[in-house]
Amino acid sequence: MTDSTRSLRNCLAPAKLNLFLHITGRRPNGYHDLQSVFQLLNWGDTLHFTLRDDGKVARATDVPGVPEQSDLVVRAANLLKAHTGTAAGVDIEIDKCLPMGAGLGGGSSDAATTLLALNRLWQLDLPRAELQSLAVKLGADVPFFVFGKNAFAEGIGEELAEVELPTRWFLVVTPRVHVPTAEIFSDELLTRDSKPVTITDFLAQQSSDARWPDSFGRNDMQQVVTSKYAEVAQVVKWLYNVAPARMTGSGASVFAAFQSKQQAEAAKAQLPAGWNGAVAESLNEHPLFAFAS
């Protein structure tokens, strides 16, 4: 990343994985209570921010299928601008890397990187807690990325507690299918009564188990998604023959963990022709963590 008084270049918006995802209840307003552990990855979209003197917020990159004013990046910048009353503006360029509808948090991460970067570029110096309260208005996953640490999440995903996770390498395989999150959450067959667990439960079973993530929990959405989307089921089955595999979020991406980059790359090399896979290292902290206190 490069930093100047007029611009911030090469700001990573990291992907996340749900190492497990349990749905423990449903609220009267339709939202679901969940428990999960969010893992940051050193892989994601890259954003570039340049100051404007006319006060306007503009997206300088076309993102197919995402109109500018509904883009979470633009919405995040306008929300921060309205909240603080700053006269500053910004041009935002986005180098998209993460697929949409994949369970990797791409749009949410872009929004969080925007909040953190503009907190620095616009010299706002808002505390992290204040940025997180804004992030809630943009989506359930955005507060986690502003939080900036690997986390045990509860509630609708906004109750976060830092967890220390070992360094791992991941192979993430994304089938060519878009899984609408709302469709999965509304499915009658979705498990909504998983027994609550604790951070201690998770940490006790994940630290050194060779069968991890199999050794702890599951993704409650996986069975519904694989029953509806054969492409996801095919990836889960194939990857599971290489290493314990699990879907992240509401899909469609599926991941497996490895102890080394070499192991992950070797698994990637075996992918069937035409499949989309990426090897990524775990992160302990968001690259822009220092941009809020």
Swiss-Prot record:
<dbReference type="InterPro" id="IPR013750">
    <property type="entry name" value="GHMP_kinase_C_dom"/>
</dbReference>
<dbReference type="InterPro" id="IPR036554">
    <property type="entry name" value="GHMP_kinase_C_sf"/>
</dbReference>
<keyword id="KW-0067">ATP-binding</keyword>
<dbReference type="GO" id="GO:0005524">
    <property type="term" value="F:ATP binding"/>
</dbReference>
<keyword id="KW-0418">Kinase</keyword>
<dbReference type="GO" id="GO:0016114">
    <property type="term" value="P:terpenoid biosynthetic process"/>
</dbReference>
<dbReference type="Pfam" id="PF00288">
    <property type="entry name" value="GHMP_kinases_N"/>
</dbReference>
<dbReference type="GO" id="GO:0050515">
    <property type="term" value="F:4-(cytidine 5'-diphospho)-2-C-methyl-D-erythritol kinase activity"/>
</dbReference>
<dbReference type="InterPro" id="IPR004424">
    <property type="entry name" value="IspE"/>
</dbReference>
<dbReference type="InterPro" id="IPR006204">
    <property type="entry name" value="GHMP_kinase_N_dom"/>
</dbReference>
<comment type="similarity">
    <text>Belongs to the GHMP kinase family. IspE subfamily.</text>
</comment>
<feature type="binding site">
    <location>
        <begin position="99"/>
        <end position="109"/>
    </location>
    <ligand>
        <name>ATP</name>
    </ligand>
</feature>
<feature type="active site">
    <location>
        <position position="141"/>
    </location>
</feature>
<feature type="active site">
    <location>
        <position position="16"/>
    </location>
</feature>
<keyword id="KW-0808">Transferase</keyword>
<comment type="function">
    <text>Catalyzes the phosphorylation of the position 2 hydroxy group of 4-diphosphocytidyl-2C-methyl-D-erythritol.</text>
</comment>
<comment type="pathway">
    <text>Isoprenoid biosynthesis; isopentenyl diphosphate biosynthesis via DXP pathway; isopentenyl diphosphate from 1-deoxy-D-xylulose 5-phosphate: step 3/6.</text>
</comment>
<protein>
    <recommendedName>
        <fullName>4-diphosphocytidyl-2-C-methyl-D-erythritol kinase</fullName>
        <ecNumber>2.7.1.148</ecNumber>
    </recommendedName>
</protein>
<dbReference type="Pfam" id="PF08544">
    <property type="entry name" value="GHMP_kinases_C"/>
</dbReference>
<keyword id="KW-0414">Isoprene biosynthesis</keyword>
<dbReference type="InterPro" id="IPR014721">
    <property type="entry name" value="Ribsml_uS5_D2-typ_fold_subgr"/>
</dbReference>
<dbReference type="InterPro" id="IPR020568">
    <property type="entry name" value="Ribosomal_Su5_D2-typ_SF"/>
</dbReference>
<keyword id="KW-0547">Nucleotide-binding</keyword>
<dbReference type="GO" id="GO:0019288">
    <property type="term" value="P:isopentenyl diphosphate biosynthetic process, methylerythritol 4-phosphate pathway"/>
</dbReference>
